Amino acid sequence: MAPDILQAFMTEKTQNAPQSGKVGFISLGCPKALVDSERILTQLRLDGYDVVPTYDDADIVVVNTCGFIDAAKQESLDAIGEAISENGKVIVTGCMGVEADRIRETHPGVLAVSGPHAYEEVVGAVHQYVPPRKEHDPFLDLVPPQGVKLTPRHYAYLKISEGCNHRCTFCIIPSMRGDLVSRPIGDVMDEAKRLVDAGVKEILVISQDTSAYGVDIKYRTGFWQGRPVKTKMQALCEALGEMGVWVRLHYVYPYPHVDDIIPLMAEGKILPYLDIPFQHASPRVLKAMKRPAHDSKTLERIRKWREICPELTIRSTFIVGFPGETEEDFQYLLDWLDEAQLDRVGAFTYSAVEGAPANELEGAVPEEVKEKRLARFMAKQAEISAARLQAKIGRTIDVLIDEVDEEGAIGRSKADAPEIDGMVYLNDETELVPGQIVQAVVEHADEHDLWARLI
């Protein structure tokens, strides 16, 4: 499916206002890339450009690409091709931008190519090909203090660092985004406050490796509102927990100090939710991935986390069919799933990515075997997820409303992140509004979603 151009932010113009340059924008990939798109769009709006929703209305189109796996690269190339065909003036940025030669070879008409988080380069290229109007009046083109956001008004992503110090053999992110660079704690907290002041009810903390926040600067003590705060995940969570909104942690690598976050969840300071990518369970496969290989310790930690915080929701992702994965390894993973009883799980088959060290490993798993293992894996997890959601029937939960139509309201519980987890359906509740937090009793569940009745 071809991506839609995102209509990010529109302002009313006075009848006599000078004509603005008009930019179309396509944002592909993960929430980290979405935050990059928001930053670029914010600067373009500050410079007087309008963001428009169609190719025909745009003077130029920016495509923020994804390069995580080959399928994502192909989607990016297809999006670039569509933008060139429909508009003709295209600037490319994002993770696939590190493969500039391939992009230009496939699409010679591209005007400029830059890599991830190259904000100034992108804005500079837009200025070059569609110069900003000299009569730009910032009072006519007001940008909200929180900047341009591509998410609904009631939730937002908060990126705390860039890059990653790990060298997982299946991943090329460090080659695209570099080593870990943590944002100053004061800057992160200032942005969080702007979001809350703008009405955001849920902050989703993201990075390539959230639990490594501050490692690169030795957990330096920063300052926010006149008080010292360490550049460290626990200190960040404690500070965010004082803001009175939902705080959800994503991309948490299973370092030992993650244990220190669980009491904050039990106390209600941040949401009892961990997005923690385990990737596999077999020690042999994990070693080949260059991931932590202490599966028994991981299970024990999960048990302790749930003892401290019984409401804890654990989401994870896994790769099946990694080079060298035997049937014994895969069965080990299924047995581990049975013990771990994770709440939410995503999985995909291993796919060779250009530049990934895993490509050189022996024991490639046939595609047919990969697909069968994926189906078995997801069937197993569907049983687990269904049972865990069934256990919620009769319980009262908080629901953050995402959308309302003529059939009722759709929201999410504290156990559900946007886009990737389940929904809570409140049938016939047409008077609610997005961003509202309500209490409801769960009446029905399947393996993904809940149906509830408003109290």
Swiss-Prot record:
[4Fe-4S] cluster 2 binds at C164, C168, C171. It catalyses: L-aspartate(89)-[ribosomal protein uS12]-hydrogen + (sulfur carrier)-SH + AH2 + 2 S-adenosyl-L-methionine = 3-methylsulfanyl-L-aspartate(89)-[ribosomal protein uS12]-hydrogen + (sulfur carrier)-H + 5'-deoxyadenosine + L-methionine + A + S-adenosyl-L-homocysteine + 2 H(+). GO terms for cellular component: cytosol. SUPFAM superfamilies: Radical SAM enzymes (SSF102114). Its EC number is 2.8.4.4. One of its GO terms (biological process) is tRNA modification. One of its GO terms (molecular function) is protein methylthiotransferase activity. Binds 2 [4Fe-4S] clusters. One cluster is coordinated with 3 cysteines and an exchangeable S-adenosyl-L-methionine. It is found in: Cytoplasm. Its main location: cytoplasm. The keyword Cytoplasm applies. Its cofactor is [4Fe-4S] cluster. Residues 21-131 form the MTTase N-terminal domain. Keywords: 4Fe-4S, Cytoplasm, Iron, Iron-sulfur, Metal-binding, S-adenosyl-L-methionine, Transferase. Belongs to the methylthiotransferase family. RimO subfamily. This is Ribosomal protein uS12 methylthiotransferase RimO. It comes from Marinobacter nauticus (strain ATCC 700491 / DSM 11845 / VT8) (Marinobacter aquaeolei).
